[in-house]
């Protein structure tokens, strides 16, 4: 497999790989499609700093001029946050975007692929994609789920995005053999909310336990990732029933406007932020910081074991 012409690893990340230090991968869709400017670039920088403060090296992943970048400079972060010509890349898009020299933010799926190519095993995001509501009619299921089934990277998030069908997303992951693990919780968190009423199959209390599960899974040759659900801190959690009603209203609006596919999630997140008068964006920012802290601790523990 020849990835050299396509992969560009930032010096800080390259040195950490060489010296076998803990590294945490970060996606870029949250920067270009998930939050408005200037919050997006501020959050990206703060997340990287949070990871550094906890003794790991951040590696924000994006595609710039057809190169898979593992670790971004300040200028590149700013470019991803402000440019209007940033595509959204999942697994199916990578060959086209690289071959044509385009710029793209990486989804959970694409970030997992690039992280694994670079040798990074821990990845932090806000929320994963999953089975959309009414997927039995639309067949709208995120490629993130298949990636979790096939790519050896542990993903830390605040649960599936709240706009999804959480029960079906959990069922899908279980069908494809992806361990779904609640960090200090028995319930699958619902992104903006700690509660969902849906139980997780396994609960763990420490980053060390998670690192041990990762090592055991891959020692056994069991292909695929691990999904770690880390609830948003209590003080920032939104009421589950209220946010669910807001989401239903946003989905109705999307249907009226015939918004589908890749455009749907950014539209819904933006509409929900508008309807909650900015509360959902605040929650989104805090849950990402919380996930970054946990991700750094898991990366350090996994580093000791491996």
Swiss-Prot record:
Keywords: Glycosidase, Hydrolase, Lyase, Manganese, Metal-binding
Residues binding substrate: 88, 108, 142-144
Keyword Metal-binding assigned: yes
Active-site residues annotated for this sequence: 27 (proton donor), 161 (nucleophile)
Residue positions binding Mn(2+): 140
Catalysis: reaction(s): D-ribose 5-phosphate + uracil = psi-UMP + H2O
Organism: Petrotoga mobilis (strain DSM 10674 / SJ95)
Pfam families recorded: Indigoidine_A
GO biological process: nucleobase catabolic process
Keyword match DNA repair: no
Name this polypeptide is given: Pseudouridine-5'-phosphate glycosidase
EC number: 4.2.1.70
Enzyme class: lyase
Family: Belongs to the pseudouridine-5'-phosphate glycosidase family.
Designated gene of the protein: psuG
Function comment: Catalyzes the reversible cleavage of pseudouridine 5'-phosphate (PsiMP) to ribose 5-phosphate and uracil. Functions biologically in the cleavage direction, as part of a pseudouridine degradation pathway.
Known partners and oligomeric status: Homotrimer.
Co-factor(s): Mn(2+)
GO cellular component annotations of the record: cytoplasm
């Amino acid at each position: 497999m020849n990835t050299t012409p396509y992969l560009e690893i930032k010096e800080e990340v390259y040195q950490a790989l060489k010296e076998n230090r803990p590294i945490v991968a970060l996606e870029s869709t949250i920067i270009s499609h998930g939050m408005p400017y200037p919050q997006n670039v501020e959050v990206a920088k703060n997340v990287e700093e949070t990871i550094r403060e906890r003794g790991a090296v951040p590696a924000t992943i994006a595609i710039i001029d057809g190169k898979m970048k593992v670790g971004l400079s300040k200028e590149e972060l700013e470019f991803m946050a402000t440019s209007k010509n940033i595509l959204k890349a999942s697994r199916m898009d990578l060959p086209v975007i690289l071959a044509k020299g385009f710029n793209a933010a990486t989804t959970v799926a694409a970030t997992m692929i690039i992280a694994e190519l670079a040798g990074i095993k821990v990845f932090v995001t806000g929320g994963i994609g999953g089975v959309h509501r009414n997927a039995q009619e639309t067949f709208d299921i995120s490629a993130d789920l298949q990636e979790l089934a096939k790519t050896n990277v542990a993903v830390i998030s605040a649960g599936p995005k709240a706009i999804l069908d959480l029960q079906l997303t959990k069922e899908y992951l279980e069908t494809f053999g992806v361990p779904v693990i609640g960090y200090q919780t028995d319930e699958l968190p619902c992104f903006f909310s700690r509660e969902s009423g849906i139980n997780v199959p396994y609960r763990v209390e420490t980053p060390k336990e998670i690192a041990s599960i990762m090592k055991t899974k891959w020692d056994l040759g069991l292909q695929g990732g691990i999904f770690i659900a880390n609830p948003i801190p209590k003080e920032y959690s939104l009421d589950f029933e209220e946010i669910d009603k807001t989401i239903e209203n946003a989905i109705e609006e999307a249907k009226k406007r015939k918004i589908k596919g890749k455009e749907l999630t950014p539209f819904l997140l933006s509409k929900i932020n508008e309807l909650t008068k900015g509360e959902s964006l605040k929650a989104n920012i805090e849950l990402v910081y919380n996930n970054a802290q946990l991700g750094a601790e898991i990366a350090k523990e996994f580093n000791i074991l491996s």
